[in-house]
């Protein structure tokens, strides 16, 4: 059983960020692998049998509400990261992992102006599509150990198949299983069509 953990889902899902966890679970199940999602709200929830950890995006008020709990579990998050547990962090989730030194070598500083736009970001030979809304100077995409972090909002994995495959590969490799192809070709085709439509719309917006 592959276990996918999500931190504070009631607080860190401002732009549908937990859609990333949903698409991972659906993809694993479509490929014939059993998995479950679990809620993480305290350090004791961060157990070694987790195969993936997700940190979403929240408002200032949301982060204020969970501030003490997040501070308490940050050292355990760092230990799991160092031990190879895969993860994904989105927008302010990324910022907080930098602030609490779960991610190292980065500094989150506030810029004079806020950037709010659809973004197509070049990542090697690939492009990453998403919406950027921040006044912090962190990189749009960052990888550390087995984690991926992005300043782009929302369900980034649903829009970017290569990034989805990368994260799925990290999860299954850590869990010690092979990543099969999707058995149900009709679902795979429908997903590809949906992604194409999203790319068409948002690339047009990004070029405006």
What do these predicted regions represent?
Residues 45-49, 81-83, 124, 142-145:
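Flexible, charged surface loops at secondary-structure boundaries
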Residues 52-56, 88, 149-151:
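Structural motif
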Residues 99-148, 152-155:
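Pocket-forming structural segment of enzyme catalytic cores
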């Amino acid at each position: 059983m592959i276990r996918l953990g999500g931190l504070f889902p009631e607080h860190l899902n401002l732009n549908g960020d937990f859609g990333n966890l949903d698409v991972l679970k659906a993809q694993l199940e479509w490929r014939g692998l059993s998995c479950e999602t679990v809620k993480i709200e305290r350090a004791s929830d961060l157990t070694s049998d987790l195969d993936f950890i997700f940190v979403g995006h929240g408002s200032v008020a949301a982060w204020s509400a969970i501030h003490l709990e997040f501070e308490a579990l940050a050292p355990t998050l760092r230990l799991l990261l160092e031990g190879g547990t895969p993860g994904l962090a989105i927008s302010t989730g990324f910022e907080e992992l930098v602030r609490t030194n779960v991610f190292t070598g980065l500094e989150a500083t506030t810029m004079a102006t806020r950037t709010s736009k659809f973004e197509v970001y070049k990542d090697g030979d690939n492009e990453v599509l998403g919406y950027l809304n921040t006044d912090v100077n962190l990189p749009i995409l960052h990888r550390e150990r087995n984690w991926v972090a992005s300043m782009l909002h929302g369900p980034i994995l649903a829009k970017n198949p290569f990034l989805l495959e990368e994260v799925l590969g990290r999860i299954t490799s850590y869990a010690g299983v092979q990543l099969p192809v999707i058995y149900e070709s009709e679902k795979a085709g429908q997903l590809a069509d949906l992604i194409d439509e999203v790319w068409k719309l948002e690339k047009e917006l990004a070029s405006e």
